[in-house]
Amino acid sequence: MRRLCTFGMMLALTTGCSPPAPQAPQATSEPVSKLGIRPQGDTEIQPDLSQVPPEVQKVFAYIDEHIDEHVENLQKWIRQPSISNSGEGIPESAEMVKGFFDELGCQQTQIFDVGVTEYGAPGNPVVYAKCDEGAEKTLMIYWMYDTMPVTQPDAWMAPPFEGRLVEQAPYKKVLIGRGATNSKGPQMSQLNAFRAIKAVHGRLPVNLIFVAEGDEERMDIGLRKFVKDHPELLEGADGMLRFGSQSPSGSGGYGGGSEGCVYVELTTSGTAWGRGPTVSDIHGSNKRSVDSPAWRHIKMLASLVSDDGNTPLIDGFLEGIQPLTEWQEADLKNAAARTDLKVAAENVGVARYISDDPYTMLKMQRYGTSFNLDGIWGGNMYAGGAGAILPNKVTSKHNFRYVPNMTGPDIVKKLRAQLDKNGYKDVEVKMIGDVPWAKMNSDNDAGRALKRAYEVMNIPHGELRADWGIGGGGGAAGGYWPAYLFGNGEVGEKVSSYAGIPIAAGGGGYGGRAHAANEFYVIEGAGRVYGMAGAEKVVAAMAYAFAGRIPPAPSPTN
Protein backbone atom coordinates (compact mmCIF):
# COMPACT_ATOMS: atom_id res chain seq x y z
CA MET A 1 0.00 0.00 0.00
CA ARG A 2 1.30 3.46 -0.91
CA ARG A 3 0.78 6.05 1.80
CA LEU A 4 1.21 9.78 1.22
CA CYS A 5 3.76 11.14 3.66
CA THR A 6 2.48 14.43 5.05
CA PHE A 7 4.55 17.33 6.20
CA GLY A 8 4.34 20.04 8.79
CA MET A 9 4.03 23.66 7.91
CA MET A 10 7.77 24.23 8.19
CA LEU A 11 9.26 21.73 5.78
CA ALA A 12 12.77 21.93 7.15
CA LEU A 13 11.57 20.86 10.59
CA THR A 14 9.45 17.95 9.46
CA THR A 15 10.30 14.30 9.93
CA GLY A 16 8.21 11.23 9.34
CA CYS A 17 4.54 11.05 8.44
CA SER A 18 1.49 12.57 10.04
CA PRO A 19 -1.52 10.36 10.70
CA PRO A 20 -4.26 10.40 8.10
CA ALA A 21 -7.13 12.84 8.43
CA PRO A 22 -9.67 11.82 11.06
CA GLN A 23 -12.89 10.49 9.63
CA ALA A 24 -15.56 13.19 9.61
CA PRO A 25 -19.14 12.39 10.60
CA GLN A 26 -21.50 11.64 7.75
CA ALA A 27 -23.56 14.62 6.65
CA THR A 28 -27.23 14.84 7.44
CA SER A 29 -27.65 18.60 7.04
CA GLU A 30 -30.19 20.10 4.68
CA PRO A 31 -29.26 22.53 1.89
CA VAL A 32 -28.77 26.03 3.30
CA SER A 33 -29.28 28.29 0.26
CA LYS A 34 -32.19 28.96 -2.07
CA LEU A 35 -30.98 29.87 -5.55
CA GLY A 36 -33.40 27.41 -7.10
CA ILE A 37 -30.77 25.67 -9.24
CA ARG A 38 -32.05 22.61 -11.11
CA PRO A 39 -29.20 20.07 -10.88
CA GLN A 40 -30.18 18.31 -14.09
CA GLY A 41 -31.18 21.51 -15.88
CA ASP A 42 -32.30 20.68 -19.40
CA THR A 43 -29.54 18.15 -20.00
CA GLU A 44 -30.72 15.21 -22.09
CA ILE A 45 -28.10 12.77 -20.78
CA GLN A 46 -27.94 11.39 -17.25
CA PRO A 47 -25.54 9.34 -15.15
CA ASP A 48 -25.94 5.58 -15.36
CA LEU A 49 -26.25 4.83 -11.66
CA SER A 50 -26.14 1.09 -12.32
CA GLN A 51 -22.44 1.47 -13.12
CA VAL A 52 -21.42 2.97 -9.77
CA PRO A 53 -21.53 1.53 -6.25
CA PRO A 54 -23.88 2.92 -3.58
CA GLU A 55 -21.11 5.04 -2.02
CA VAL A 56 -20.82 7.01 -5.28
CA GLN A 57 -24.60 7.19 -5.71
CA LYS A 58 -24.81 8.84 -2.29
CA VAL A 59 -22.24 11.45 -3.34
CA PHE A 60 -24.19 12.17 -6.52
CA ALA A 61 -27.36 12.66 -4.47
CA TYR A 62 -25.56 14.99 -2.06
CA ILE A 63 -24.32 17.10 -4.97
CA ASP A 64 -27.86 17.48 -6.29
CA GLU A 65 -29.23 18.38 -2.86
CA HIS A 66 -26.54 21.00 -2.21
CA ILE A 67 -26.09 22.48 -5.68
CA ASP A 68 -27.37 25.92 -4.57
CA GLU A 69 -24.67 26.06 -1.93
CA HIS A 70 -22.07 24.87 -4.43
CA VAL A 71 -22.97 27.63 -6.87
CA GLU A 72 -22.70 30.17 -4.06
CA ASN A 73 -19.18 28.88 -3.39
CA LEU A 74 -18.28 29.83 -6.95
CA GLN A 75 -19.96 33.23 -6.65
CA LYS A 76 -17.89 34.02 -3.56
CA TRP A 77 -14.70 33.14 -5.42
CA ILE A 78 -15.67 35.22 -8.46
CA ARG A 79 -16.25 38.21 -6.17
CA GLN A 80 -12.60 38.12 -5.13
CA PRO A 81 -10.53 39.71 -7.94
CA SER A 82 -7.27 37.90 -8.67
CA ILE A 83 -5.58 39.73 -11.53
CA SER A 84 -2.00 38.55 -11.87
CA ASN A 85 -0.82 41.15 -14.36
CA SER A 86 -1.77 44.05 -12.08
CA GLY A 87 -1.49 42.28 -8.74
CA GLU A 88 -5.02 43.24 -7.74
CA GLY A 89 -6.33 40.80 -5.17
CA ILE A 90 -3.47 38.34 -5.50
CA PRO A 91 -2.44 38.19 -1.80
CA GLU A 92 -6.07 37.92 -0.71
CA SER A 93 -6.74 35.25 -3.34
CA ALA A 94 -3.79 33.16 -2.23
CA GLU A 95 -5.12 33.24 1.33
CA MET A 96 -8.59 32.37 0.07
CA VAL A 97 -7.31 29.32 -1.82
CA LYS A 98 -5.30 28.22 1.21
CA GLY A 99 -8.53 28.49 3.17
CA PHE A 100 -10.24 26.17 0.68
CA PHE A 101 -7.59 23.53 1.32
CA ASP A 102 -7.74 24.05 5.09
CA GLU A 103 -11.51 23.56 5.03
CA LEU A 104 -11.08 20.37 3.03
CA GLY A 105 -8.98 19.02 5.88
CA CYS A 106 -5.57 18.99 4.22
CA GLN A 107 -2.88 18.49 6.87
CA GLN A 108 -0.37 20.74 5.13
CA THR A 109 -1.32 24.00 3.47
CA GLN A 110 1.28 26.61 2.67
CA ILE A 111 1.66 29.79 0.63
CA PHE A 112 5.09 29.93 -1.02
CA ASP A 113 6.70 33.26 -1.87
CA VAL A 114 8.70 32.27 -4.94
CA GLY A 115 10.74 35.49 -5.15
CA VAL A 116 12.23 37.01 -8.29
CA THR A 117 12.02 34.83 -11.40
CA GLU A 118 14.55 34.29 -14.16
CA TYR A 119 12.70 36.87 -16.27
CA GLY A 120 13.43 39.63 -13.75
CA ALA A 121 9.89 40.00 -12.41
CA PRO A 122 8.75 38.69 -9.02
CA GLY A 123 6.47 35.69 -9.18
CA ASN A 124 3.09 35.52 -7.48
CA PRO A 125 2.61 33.08 -4.60
CA VAL A 126 2.09 29.37 -5.16
CA VAL A 127 -0.42 27.72 -2.82
CA TYR A 128 0.47 24.13 -1.99
CA ALA A 129 -1.42 21.50 -0.03
CA LYS A 130 -1.21 17.81 0.87
CA CYS A 131 -4.22 15.84 2.02
CA ASP A 132 -3.52 12.39 3.47
CA GLU A 133 -6.70 10.33 3.38
CA GLY A 134 -4.99 7.04 4.16
CA ALA A 135 -5.55 5.92 0.58
CA GLU A 136 -3.36 3.75 -1.62
CA LYS A 137 -3.13 6.22 -4.50
CA THR A 138 -2.46 9.95 -4.70
CA LEU A 139 -3.90 12.36 -7.23
CA MET A 140 -2.27 15.71 -7.95
CA ILE A 141 -4.58 18.62 -8.77
CA TYR A 142 -3.26 21.60 -10.75
CA TRP A 143 -4.99 24.94 -10.26
CA MET A 144 -4.56 28.53 -11.35
CA TYR A 145 -6.16 31.14 -9.10
CA ASP A 146 -5.30 34.18 -11.24
CA THR A 147 -7.36 35.68 -14.04
CA MET A 148 -7.01 38.20 -16.82
CA PRO A 149 -7.95 41.84 -16.14
CA VAL A 150 -11.23 43.38 -17.23
CA THR A 151 -10.29 45.60 -20.17
CA GLN A 152 -13.77 46.54 -21.43
CA PRO A 153 -16.10 46.86 -18.42
CA ASP A 154 -18.85 48.55 -20.46
CA ALA A 155 -19.15 45.46 -22.67
CA TRP A 156 -20.26 43.23 -19.78
CA MET A 157 -23.95 42.38 -19.31
CA ALA A 158 -23.30 42.10 -15.55
CA PRO A 159 -20.50 43.36 -13.30
CA PRO A 160 -17.51 41.05 -13.86
CA PHE A 161 -16.91 40.47 -10.14
CA GLU A 162 -20.53 39.91 -9.09
CA GLY A 163 -21.16 36.33 -10.18
CA ARG A 164 -24.65 37.03 -11.50
CA LEU A 165 -26.80 34.20 -12.85
CA VAL A 166 -28.42 34.96 -16.21
CA GLU A 167 -30.17 33.09 -18.99
CA GLN A 168 -28.12 32.47 -22.11
CA ALA A 169 -29.65 30.22 -24.73
CA PRO A 170 -29.73 27.27 -24.70
CA TYR A 171 -28.89 27.42 -20.98
CA LYS A 172 -31.44 28.67 -18.44
CA LYS A 173 -28.69 29.63 -16.00
CA VAL A 174 -25.07 30.56 -16.57
CA LEU A 175 -22.80 32.47 -14.21
CA ILE A 176 -21.22 35.62 -15.64
CA GLY A 177 -17.89 36.74 -14.22
CA ARG A 178 -14.19 37.14 -14.77
CA GLY A 179 -12.61 33.75 -14.23
CA ALA A 180 -15.94 31.94 -14.58
CA THR A 181 -14.61 29.42 -17.09
CA ASN A 182 -10.90 30.26 -16.90
CA SER A 183 -10.75 28.76 -14.47
CA LYS A 184 -12.65 29.23 -11.22
CA GLY A 185 -15.81 27.45 -12.41
CA PRO A 186 -14.20 24.12 -13.33
CA GLN A 187 -11.90 24.28 -10.29
CA MET A 188 -14.72 25.02 -7.85
CA SER A 189 -16.56 22.05 -9.37
CA GLN A 190 -13.56 19.94 -8.39
CA LEU A 191 -13.46 21.33 -4.87
CA ASN A 192 -17.23 20.97 -4.42
CA ALA A 193 -16.95 17.33 -5.48
CA PHE A 194 -14.20 16.62 -2.96
CA ARG A 195 -16.17 18.42 -0.24
CA ALA A 196 -19.25 16.37 -1.11
CA ILE A 197 -17.34 13.10 -0.79
CA LYS A 198 -15.97 14.08 2.61
CA ALA A 199 -19.37 15.31 3.78
CA VAL A 200 -20.97 11.97 2.89
CA HIS A 201 -18.21 9.51 3.76
CA GLY A 202 -15.73 11.42 5.91
CA ARG A 203 -12.77 10.51 3.74
CA LEU A 204 -11.70 10.76 0.11
CA PRO A 205 -10.90 7.63 -1.92
CA VAL A 206 -7.53 9.14 -2.89
CA ASN A 207 -4.90 11.31 -1.28
CA LEU A 208 -4.50 14.75 -2.86
CA ILE A 209 -1.67 17.13 -3.67
CA PHE A 210 -2.79 20.62 -4.73
CA VAL A 211 -0.53 23.02 -6.63
CA ALA A 212 -2.26 26.37 -7.26
CA GLU A 213 -0.37 29.08 -9.10
CA GLY A 214 -1.04 32.81 -9.40
CA ASP A 215 0.91 33.38 -12.61
CA GLU A 216 -0.83 31.36 -15.30
CA GLU A 217 -1.72 34.56 -17.14
CA ARG A 218 1.91 35.68 -16.74
CA MET A 219 3.46 32.69 -18.50
CA ASP A 220 3.62 30.64 -15.26
CA ILE A 221 6.80 32.46 -14.27
CA GLY A 222 6.31 31.90 -10.53
CA LEU A 223 5.27 28.26 -10.86
CA ARG A 224 8.29 27.56 -13.05
CA LYS A 225 10.57 28.79 -10.25
CA PHE A 226 8.58 26.90 -7.61
CA VAL A 227 9.01 23.60 -9.46
CA LYS A 228 12.71 24.31 -9.98
CA ASP A 229 13.21 25.10 -6.29
CA HIS A 230 10.94 22.44 -4.76
CA PRO A 231 10.74 19.36 -7.01
CA GLU A 232 10.53 17.15 -3.92
CA LEU A 233 7.10 18.59 -3.08
CA LEU A 234 5.66 17.00 -6.20
CA GLU A 235 6.85 13.50 -5.37
CA GLY A 236 4.43 10.79 -4.33
CA ALA A 237 1.62 11.43 -6.80
CA ASP A 238 0.44 8.65 -9.10
CA GLY A 239 -1.27 10.91 -11.62
CA MET A 240 -2.70 14.37 -12.20
CA LEU A 241 -6.18 15.67 -12.99
CA ARG A 242 -6.21 19.05 -14.67
CA PHE A 243 -9.56 20.84 -14.85
CA GLY A 244 -11.41 20.72 -18.15
CA SER A 245 -14.87 20.74 -19.67
CA GLN A 246 -17.01 19.38 -22.46
CA SER A 247 -17.06 20.78 -25.96
CA PRO A 248 -20.09 22.86 -27.07
CA SER A 249 -21.53 19.67 -28.59
CA GLY A 250 -21.04 17.76 -25.34
CA SER A 251 -17.94 15.66 -26.05
CA GLY A 252 -15.37 14.97 -23.36
CA GLY A 253 -11.62 15.02 -23.95
CA TYR A 254 -8.47 13.85 -22.20
CA GLY A 255 -5.87 16.47 -23.09
CA GLY A 256 -2.90 16.67 -20.78
CA GLY A 257 -0.49 18.00 -23.38
CA SER A 258 0.04 21.62 -24.33
CA GLU A 259 1.10 23.88 -27.14
CA GLY A 260 4.04 26.22 -26.61
CA CYS A 261 3.77 29.98 -26.13
CA VAL A 262 6.46 32.64 -25.91
CA TYR A 263 5.58 36.22 -24.99
CA VAL A 264 7.52 39.31 -26.04
CA GLU A 265 7.35 43.09 -25.92
CA LEU A 266 8.57 45.20 -28.83
CA THR A 267 9.53 48.83 -28.20
CA THR A 268 10.34 51.59 -30.67
CA SER A 269 11.79 54.75 -29.12
CA GLY A 270 13.23 57.99 -30.34
CA THR A 271 16.27 57.42 -28.16
CA ALA A 272 17.19 54.06 -29.71
CA TRP A 273 16.24 55.18 -33.24
CA GLY A 274 18.15 58.44 -33.04
CA ARG A 275 15.20 60.34 -34.53
CA GLY A 276 12.01 61.86 -33.13
CA PRO A 277 11.31 62.75 -29.48
CA THR A 278 13.79 61.32 -26.98
CA VAL A 279 13.28 62.53 -23.42
CA SER A 280 9.46 62.41 -23.39
CA ASP A 281 6.35 62.85 -25.51
CA ILE A 282 6.18 66.26 -27.18
CA HIS A 283 3.49 68.48 -28.69
CA GLY A 284 1.83 66.90 -31.72
CA SER A 285 2.30 70.03 -33.81
CA ASN A 286 5.97 69.09 -34.08
CA LYS A 287 5.10 66.21 -36.42
CA ARG A 288 5.37 68.68 -39.30
CA SER A 289 9.13 68.69 -38.81
CA VAL A 290 9.93 65.70 -36.55
CA ASP A 291 9.98 61.94 -37.23
CA SER A 292 7.48 59.71 -35.40
CA PRO A 293 8.58 56.59 -33.47
CA ALA A 294 4.88 55.64 -33.37
CA TRP A 295 4.53 55.47 -37.15
CA ARG A 296 7.83 53.61 -37.32
CA HIS A 297 6.46 51.06 -34.88
CA ILE A 298 3.34 50.55 -37.00
CA LYS A 299 5.45 50.08 -40.14
CA MET A 300 7.70 47.66 -38.27
CA LEU A 301 4.76 45.52 -37.16
CA ALA A 302 3.33 45.48 -40.67
CA SER A 303 6.63 44.14 -42.00
CA LEU A 304 6.33 41.05 -39.77
CA VAL A 305 2.96 39.72 -40.99
CA SER A 306 1.01 39.15 -44.19
CA ASP A 307 -1.54 41.76 -45.26
CA ASP A 308 -4.36 39.86 -43.53
CA GLY A 309 -2.34 39.59 -40.31
CA ASN A 310 -2.58 35.80 -40.24
CA THR A 311 0.84 34.63 -41.46
CA PRO A 312 4.12 35.58 -39.75
CA LEU A 313 6.73 36.85 -42.23
CA ILE A 314 9.71 35.68 -40.21
CA ASP A 315 12.41 33.70 -41.99
CA GLY A 316 12.55 30.10 -40.75
CA PHE A 317 9.58 30.56 -38.43
CA LEU A 318 8.02 27.21 -39.33
CA GLU A 319 11.26 25.22 -39.26
CA GLY A 320 11.10 22.07 -37.14
CA ILE A 321 7.33 21.62 -37.16
CA GLN A 322 6.36 17.97 -36.95
CA PRO A 323 3.63 16.77 -39.32
CA LEU A 324 0.43 15.48 -37.78
CA THR A 325 0.09 11.76 -37.29
CA GLU A 326 -2.48 9.70 -39.15
CA TRP A 327 -4.51 9.40 -35.96
CA GLN A 328 -4.43 13.16 -35.31
CA GLU A 329 -5.74 13.81 -38.81
CA ALA A 330 -8.54 11.28 -38.30
CA ASP A 331 -9.37 12.74 -34.89
CA LEU A 332 -9.68 16.21 -36.43
CA LYS A 333 -12.03 14.90 -39.12
CA ASN A 334 -14.21 13.19 -36.52
CA ALA A 335 -14.34 16.34 -34.41
CA ALA A 336 -15.09 18.48 -37.46
CA ALA A 337 -18.14 16.36 -38.23
CA ARG A 338 -19.56 17.31 -34.81
CA THR A 339 -18.60 21.00 -34.93
CA ASP A 340 -21.09 23.80 -35.58
CA LEU A 341 -18.91 26.79 -36.47
CA LYS A 342 -21.72 29.27 -35.85
CA VAL A 343 -22.26 28.02 -32.30
CA ALA A 344 -18.51 27.83 -31.69
CA ALA A 345 -18.02 31.41 -32.90
CA GLU A 346 -20.85 32.69 -30.71
CA ASN A 347 -19.41 30.97 -27.65
CA VAL A 348 -15.99 32.51 -28.26
CA GLY A 349 -17.46 35.90 -29.14
CA VAL A 350 -16.23 36.31 -32.73
CA ALA A 351 -18.05 37.17 -35.96
CA ARG A 352 -16.53 34.21 -37.78
CA TYR A 353 -13.35 32.14 -37.96
CA ILE A 354 -10.55 32.61 -40.50
CA SER A 355 -11.77 29.47 -42.26
CA ASP A 356 -15.37 28.43 -42.81
CA ASP A 357 -14.32 24.77 -42.96
CA PRO A 358 -14.65 23.02 -39.55
CA TYR A 359 -11.68 20.71 -40.22
CA THR A 360 -9.39 23.60 -41.16
CA MET A 361 -10.55 25.68 -38.21
CA LEU A 362 -9.95 22.86 -35.73
CA LYS A 363 -6.54 22.12 -37.21
CA MET A 364 -5.57 25.77 -36.82
CA GLN A 365 -6.99 25.88 -33.30
CA ARG A 366 -5.30 22.73 -32.02
CA TYR A 367 -2.07 22.49 -33.98
CA GLY A 368 -1.57 25.88 -35.62
CA THR A 369 1.01 28.60 -35.02
CA SER A 370 0.41 32.32 -34.68
CA PHE A 371 1.92 35.75 -34.03
CA ASN A 372 -0.63 37.85 -32.16
CA LEU A 373 -0.80 41.55 -31.32
CA ASP A 374 -2.11 41.49 -27.73
CA GLY A 375 -1.96 45.21 -27.09
CA ILE A 376 -0.15 48.45 -27.94
CA TRP A 377 0.36 51.68 -26.05
CA GLY A 378 2.10 55.04 -26.16
CA GLY A 379 1.20 58.71 -26.37
CA ASN A 380 -2.38 59.89 -25.80
CA MET A 381 -4.20 56.87 -24.35
CA TYR A 382 -7.35 58.68 -23.22
CA ALA A 383 -10.61 57.66 -24.90
CA GLY A 384 -12.54 60.52 -26.45
CA GLY A 385 -11.47 64.13 -26.27
CA ALA A 386 -8.36 65.37 -27.99
CA GLY A 387 -4.80 66.40 -27.20
CA ALA A 388 -1.93 66.65 -29.67
CA ILE A 389 0.91 64.28 -28.76
CA LEU A 390 3.95 63.02 -30.64
CA PRO A 391 4.99 59.96 -28.60
CA ASN A 392 8.65 59.36 -27.87
CA LYS A 393 8.07 55.62 -27.37
CA VAL A 394 5.57 52.93 -28.38
CA THR A 395 5.44 49.37 -27.00
CA SER A 396 3.39 46.41 -28.18
CA LYS A 397 2.77 42.99 -26.62
CA HIS A 398 2.81 39.76 -28.63
CA ASN A 399 2.38 36.05 -28.06
CA PHE A 400 3.70 33.39 -30.42
CA ARG A 401 1.89 30.04 -30.31
CA TYR A 402 4.15 27.19 -31.36
CA VAL A 403 4.22 23.41 -31.66
CA PRO A 404 6.79 20.58 -31.61
CA ASN A 405 9.67 20.84 -32.35
CA MET A 406 9.81 24.64 -32.27
CA THR A 407 11.23 26.44 -29.23
CA GLY A 408 10.46 29.83 -27.74
CA PRO A 409 14.06 31.10 -27.56
CA ASP A 410 14.63 30.12 -31.19
CA ILE A 411 11.51 32.03 -32.26
CA VAL A 412 12.73 35.13 -30.43
CA LYS A 413 16.14 34.76 -32.07
CA LYS A 414 14.52 34.56 -35.52
CA LEU A 415 12.33 37.57 -34.71
CA ARG A 416 15.41 39.58 -33.81
CA ALA A 417 17.12 38.56 -37.05
CA GLN A 418 14.05 39.49 -39.11
CA LEU A 419 13.80 42.91 -37.50
CA ASP A 420 17.46 43.54 -38.27
CA LYS A 421 16.98 42.38 -41.85
CA ASN A 422 13.95 44.65 -42.27
CA GLY A 423 15.92 47.67 -41.09
CA TYR A 424 14.70 47.85 -37.50
CA LYS A 425 17.86 47.15 -35.51
CA ASP A 426 16.83 49.85 -33.03
CA VAL A 427 13.62 48.06 -31.99
CA GLU A 428 13.99 46.48 -28.55
CA VAL A 429 12.84 42.87 -28.05
CA LYS A 430 12.09 41.77 -24.48
CA MET A 431 11.08 38.20 -23.63
CA ILE A 432 8.41 38.22 -20.91
CA GLY A 433 8.14 34.45 -20.53
CA ASP A 434 8.07 31.12 -22.30
CA VAL A 435 5.90 28.04 -21.81
CA PRO A 436 7.33 25.12 -23.82
CA TRP A 437 5.09 22.50 -25.41
CA ALA A 438 4.44 19.11 -23.86
CA LYS A 439 3.25 15.85 -25.40
CA MET A 440 1.10 13.42 -23.49
CA ASN A 441 0.25 9.74 -23.52
CA SER A 442 -3.41 9.78 -22.51
CA ASP A 443 -3.56 5.99 -22.05
CA ASN A 444 -2.55 6.13 -18.39
CA ASP A 445 -4.23 5.50 -15.04
CA ALA A 446 -5.53 9.07 -14.79
CA GLY A 447 -6.80 9.00 -18.37
CA ARG A 448 -8.50 5.64 -17.87
CA ALA A 449 -10.19 6.93 -14.71
CA LEU A 450 -11.44 9.99 -16.58
CA LYS A 451 -12.72 7.78 -19.39
CA ARG A 452 -14.57 5.65 -16.85
CA ALA A 453 -16.18 8.80 -15.44
CA TYR A 454 -17.32 9.78 -18.94
CA GLU A 455 -18.85 6.32 -19.36
CA VAL A 456 -20.72 6.64 -16.08
CA MET A 457 -22.00 10.09 -17.03
CA ASN A 458 -22.87 9.10 -20.65
CA ILE A 459 -20.55 11.77 -22.06
CA PRO A 460 -19.38 11.01 -25.63
CA HIS A 461 -15.60 10.61 -25.72
CA GLY A 462 -12.77 9.37 -27.86
CA GLU A 463 -10.26 6.64 -27.21
CA LEU A 464 -7.14 6.87 -25.11
CA ARG A 465 -3.94 7.11 -27.12
CA ALA A 466 -0.26 6.65 -26.39
CA ASP A 467 0.52 9.14 -29.19
CA TRP A 468 -1.90 11.80 -28.04
CA GLY A 469 0.51 14.65 -28.67
CA ILE A 470 -0.07 18.23 -27.52
CA GLY A 471 -3.86 18.45 -27.72
CA GLY A 472 -7.09 17.49 -29.37
CA GLY A 473 -9.59 14.84 -28.52
CA GLY A 474 -13.12 16.06 -28.27
CA GLY A 475 -13.14 18.39 -25.28
CA ALA A 476 -13.23 22.15 -25.30
CA ALA A 477 -10.10 23.55 -26.92
CA GLY A 478 -7.94 25.87 -24.89
CA GLY A 479 -4.57 27.57 -24.76
CA TYR A 480 -1.28 26.59 -23.27
CA TRP A 481 -0.83 25.40 -19.71
CA PRO A 482 2.38 24.41 -17.85
CA ALA A 483 2.17 20.69 -18.65
CA TYR A 484 5.92 20.69 -19.29
CA LEU A 485 6.50 21.15 -15.55
CA PHE A 486 4.48 18.06 -14.57
CA GLY A 487 4.21 15.59 -17.45
CA ASN A 488 6.27 12.45 -17.91
CA GLY A 489 6.19 12.60 -21.71
CA GLU A 490 8.29 14.49 -24.24
CA VAL A 491 8.52 18.21 -23.45
CA GLY A 492 10.03 21.23 -25.14
CA GLU A 493 12.22 21.98 -22.12
CA LYS A 494 12.96 20.17 -18.86
CA VAL A 495 13.56 22.63 -16.02
CA SER A 496 13.80 20.49 -12.88
CA SER A 497 14.76 17.08 -11.57
CA TYR A 498 11.11 16.08 -11.19
CA ALA A 499 10.46 13.01 -13.34
CA GLY A 500 6.81 13.84 -13.97
CA ILE A 501 3.56 11.90 -13.80
CA PRO A 502 0.74 10.81 -16.12
CA ILE A 503 -1.80 13.57 -16.73
CA ALA A 504 -5.45 13.64 -17.69
CA ALA A 505 -7.18 16.92 -18.49
CA GLY A 506 -10.92 17.00 -18.90
CA GLY A 507 -14.26 17.13 -17.20
CA GLY A 508 -17.95 17.80 -17.49
CA GLY A 509 -19.79 21.08 -17.85
CA TYR A 510 -18.99 23.96 -20.13
CA GLY A 511 -18.06 27.63 -20.24
CA GLY A 512 -16.89 30.20 -22.73
CA ARG A 513 -15.53 33.65 -23.60
CA ALA A 514 -12.34 33.23 -21.61
CA HIS A 515 -10.34 36.49 -21.51
CA ALA A 516 -13.36 38.28 -23.05
CA ALA A 517 -16.35 40.25 -21.86
CA ASN A 518 -19.24 38.19 -20.47
CA GLU A 519 -17.10 35.18 -19.60
CA PHE A 520 -19.50 32.47 -18.44
CA TYR A 521 -19.79 29.07 -16.80
CA VAL A 522 -22.84 26.87 -17.33
CA ILE A 523 -24.81 26.28 -14.12
CA GLU A 524 -27.86 24.50 -15.57
CA GLY A 525 -26.94 22.35 -18.55
CA ALA A 526 -28.84 21.72 -21.76
CA GLY A 527 -28.74 19.16 -24.54
CA ARG A 528 -25.67 16.97 -24.12
CA VAL A 529 -23.82 19.52 -21.97
CA TYR A 530 -23.93 19.15 -18.20
CA GLY A 531 -24.25 22.01 -15.75
CA MET A 532 -22.25 22.44 -12.56
CA ALA A 533 -23.79 19.44 -10.79
CA GLY A 534 -22.82 17.18 -13.68
CA ALA A 535 -19.31 18.62 -13.74
CA GLU A 536 -18.92 17.80 -10.05
CA LYS A 537 -20.15 14.24 -10.58
CA VAL A 538 -17.52 13.69 -13.27
CA VAL A 539 -14.83 14.69 -10.75
CA ALA A 540 -16.25 12.42 -8.06
CA ALA A 541 -16.54 9.48 -10.44
CA MET A 542 -13.00 10.05 -11.70
CA ALA A 543 -11.61 10.03 -8.15
CA TYR A 544 -13.37 6.77 -7.29
CA ALA A 545 -12.34 5.22 -10.60
CA PHE A 546 -8.72 6.27 -10.00
CA ALA A 547 -8.92 4.55 -6.63
CA GLY A 548 -10.22 1.38 -8.31
CA ARG A 549 -13.61 1.60 -6.61
CA ILE A 550 -15.80 1.77 -9.72
CA PRO A 551 -16.07 -1.53 -11.62
CA PRO A 552 -14.97 -1.71 -15.27
CA ALA A 553 -17.51 -0.72 -17.88
CA PRO A 554 -19.93 -3.49 -18.81
CA SER A 555 -19.12 -5.30 -22.04
CA PRO A 556 -21.25 -4.21 -25.00
CA THR A 557 -23.95 -6.65 -26.00
CA ASN A 558 -24.93 -7.53 -29.55
Predicted regions: what they are:
Residues 136-212:
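Active-site metal-coordination/substrate-binding segment of hydrolases
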Residues 2-8:
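Sec-dependent signal peptide recognition
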